[in-house]
Amino acid sequence: PEEDKYGTQRVISFLRQIVEQGGFWNPRDHLWVQTQNTQFVGACNPPTDPGRVPLSSRFLSHAPVLFVDYPEMQSLIQIYSTFNSALLSSKPLLMGMESSLTRAMVEFYERNKQHFLLEQQPQYVYSPRELSRWMRSLYAAMEGLPNITPAEFVRLVAHDALRLFCDRLVTAEEKTWCQETMNDVFLSIFSEVDRSVLQGPILFSRWLGGGY
């Protein structure tokens, strides 16, 4: 949480008081509220990430801190294979594509993560959240497409890749790199799909529903 004008993180100070004093003062009832057997467990990003504020060192003196890095590529493939199997389970024409879909998503994510660094632009932050957003957007788009074909599906996956990864980029050169990298990854993994499927511009829209 952000600091107030006095440099205090009020929520963190409240938690520290409970840890140190074993309770807090209730100003409405003018009573001291005692707490017992209380544990606080939280997760946060490093303070070096954009928009983050370092936690109070006084509070951290009471808390063991464990650093958990992002999953490696093989772990990401295993995690998102499970999600994508559920995603495609109701689409008979797409059965058997979950492995290719997962490899394409993770490979494209990893290439972007390695190529675009936080030092270049503050929005160039890449985490597995991108893969989760990608998967959820595919789920939302496919709700009304029970008979989507493999070619249409790959084009939809490419559309969401462009929205998630390419639209945040600043320069034309970066956008070109992103587009070419996506084409390279998709054509090598979805080898059964014709190159014309990735021809731009790609925009999916539901005109009757007013969304896209």
Where are these regions (language model features)?
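Conserved catalytic/switch belt of AAA+ P-loop NTPases
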Residues: 1-45, 57, 83-84
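Switch/connector loops and helix/strand junctions flanking conserved nucleotide-binding motifs
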Residues: 2-3, 48-54, 74-78
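Alpha-helical lid/collar subdomain of P-loop NTPases
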Residues: 36-41, 61-64, 69-212
